[in-house]
Amino acid sequence: MGRRSRAAMLPTNIILLQNLVKRDPESYQEEFLQQYAHYESLRDIFMLNGLAGGDSAAATNGLDVGNGSSTMAGTNGTTMSTSTSQLIELVGFVSQVCSCFPRETANFPSELKQLLLEHHKSLPFELKEKILSCLTMLRNKDVITAEELIQSLFPLLVAYSSHGNSLGVNSHAKELRKIIYTNLISLLKSCNTNGKNQKLNKSTQAVCFNLLDQPDSQGIWATKLTRELWRRGIWDDSRTVEIMTQAALHQDVKIVMSGVMFFLDADREREENFEENSEDEDGFDLDALRHKMQVNKKTGRRGKKLENAIKTVKKKKKNGPGAPQGYLNFSAIHLLRDPQGFAEKLFKEHLSGKTKNKFDMEQKISLMQLLSRLIGTHKLIVLGIYTFFLKYLTPKQRDVTRIMSACAQACHDLVPPEVINVMVRKIADEFVSDGVANEVAAAGINTIREICSRAPLAIDEILLQDLVEYKGSKAKGVNMAAKSLIALYRDVAPEMLKKKDRGKNAAMEVQEAKKGGKDSKRPQFGADNSVQGIAGIELLAKWKKEHGEESENEDADANWEVDVDSEEDDVDGEWVTMDSDKEYDVDMEDSDDEKDNAKGKESDSDLELSDDDDEKEVKDEQEDADIDPEAAFREIASTRILTPADFAKLQELRNEESVAKIMGIHKQDKREELVDASTLTGPIKYKQSREERLQKVLEGREGRDKFGSRRGKRDNMRSTTNREKERRKNFVMSIHKRSVRGKQKMSLRDKQKVLRAHITKQKKKGY
């Protein structure tokens, strides 16, 4: 009887039939075919009804199929017919069990795609939502491929776009776009989890390129999808960057700004996303979970929890900071295939062309920042950008500090100095002059310093010396800005400063260069500044000459084993640890006479020098100071092979030189360093209101006791002891006591006993 009642319920209870079909498909094949035939009939009715007309009414109010069919309320407030709900239920049922009957449902996925793509205007929102979820389910069951699903989702995403489309104003268009966009991200993420699915990625990127080729604004979805996949580290190749390059050169303003902001902010967003994921995994404690498993009752659930925890820890170690990242950690700007062409097109089409007026000021500043970052990173030549900056370099300009930071980033040593000099002169005239505020002057000098740090020849001596005079300003920001400019040119070109501003070390270098007839340290435009040979090799040659280790007869074992017990180790400083996995070339032809020569010279160094020896020492110091790096490299490279000890000592000498240098401005690649607009104004301290000062006073009082007497304030409430009362008693009241008067009559012997007893008691105190 139970089986008969169950069989009677199957045609109406789809959920029960679905469960039974999954358990035993062969036994319930007839019931499945019955429901599948019902689905086909409803589908045909919907398709015919959609072709007949009533697109807008069907889209908003549902479709009443059949005569006298009742309606029911939809999930979003619209009326939905019974046949619509039946079709939704049957579509979900067939999608769940189609893998059990692959022959009977071979055309089911294509029918769903046809129904969705050709009749989406007439289908109710609930049915479209159900078909989208079913297509995603079919892809998860490997019934359809990921490429087929993407080909079904992208046309709908474009069709329901709100830009220039009547369907975009549909009440459910926003929900549909969100569903499609989320499904696309999840699909691409799952397909690229175990490894890069290059076939799927290239096909999806081709669709994005096709969207951006169209002149309308539908390509905004290509930029949104690309940026999100870049943030998650799913797409990280140059083809992805080319999509955003094409977007930045588009005709539509929204697409252009989407591409521009990708190059400005996408890398930072990706790093933040990676750090957030790392922080989520850092809060896990495996040892605590193992302890709980040992103490608590062992169950299957806790065992699975422990297994999942171990997998999480292994994944964390695999993807941790020490392991290679799952994506290429390259900036998007570095992956450009033609940065020079991209920069020229960006400037020509958006900043200097006929379409420049369609961007507002905020968008123009973003374009300036991107263009300047491209020029500074790749050392490009776009000469028109420097004259374009001139009309915006005024103190009254909105967001002028961001424009000034873009000016600094766009400068490098390959740009002709006369081109940048015009911009520097404009900044000096507008910002660094009499009558301007201290913050304006500080911003101007700091901007000039940032420009000159990238292109030292961009300023002439007269203007530099005028700006340096602001070092005596009473304003702290202006003072610090001028001193930073002095510190820069002390290291780069000290001869451009006045003698009083050069400093001791820089003045000595200039004087020695003049006496020795050497070339000026001032950089020359177009000169090759690439590193040749080994950096700091002259320091090693000087050190060997001082310590008498320039002889060709050296001990090979001593050179290889750096940490040896010798007198030189005590003189030269700490031991040097050598990496065992590195390979070094060692000169094996050295003899064993080095130690004897070194010991003999060390014994001579303890003797006092005569006047002749002093003169000789001064002469040697001058010769050491005049060591040419190229000559030292040629000499050492042609006479010996550097050993691990030599490389270790060379690194040590480099560190000593950097520490010993008083005005040590670190030389670094200024192209990669971004200029923060907030740092150009310098330290600004505005006058505080009474409420702000009072708040600062109250913050200082937190965590400390109130000032005043501690009398009567004890940690534990109690009365005073007799000893405390006797000690605090007024001396005039206790001067006549017998014990006090007896001290005056005490003999010397008794006083000594009391003193010794007191000392002994003090020593024993605390033990």
Curated annotation (Swiss-Prot):
- Record PTM Phosphoserine, positions in chain: S278
Protein name from the UniProt record: Protein SDA1
- Basic and acidic residues bias locations: 511-522, 697-729
Compositionally biased, Basic residues: which spans? 730-746, 754-767
- Which controlled-vocabulary keywords does the entry list? Cell cycle, Nucleus, Phosphoprotein, Protein transport, Ribosome biogenesis, Transport
**Taxonomy of the source species:** Eukaryota, Fungi, Dikarya, Ascomycota, Saccharomycotina
Q: Which domain of life is it from?
A: Eukaryota
Residue numbers spanned by region Disordered: 500-529, 545-631, 697-767
**Gene Ontology CC terms:** nucleolus; nucleus
What subcellular compartments does it reside in?
Nucleus, Nucleolus
Entries under SUPFAM superfamilies matching the protein: ARM repeat
Q: Name one GO biological process term.
A: protein transport
* Composition bias, Acidic residues: 551-573, 586-595, 605-629
Q: Quaternary form?
A: Associated with the 60S pre-ribosomal particles. Interacts with NAP1.
Q: Extra notes?
A: Present with 3640 molecules/cell in log phase SD medium.
Its annotated function is as follows: Required for 60S pre-ribosomal subunits export to the cytoplasm. May also be required for 60S ribosomal subunit maturation and accumulation. Involved in G1 events and passage through start, and possibly actin cytoskeleton organization.
Q: Where would you say this protein principally sits, based on its record?
A: nucleus
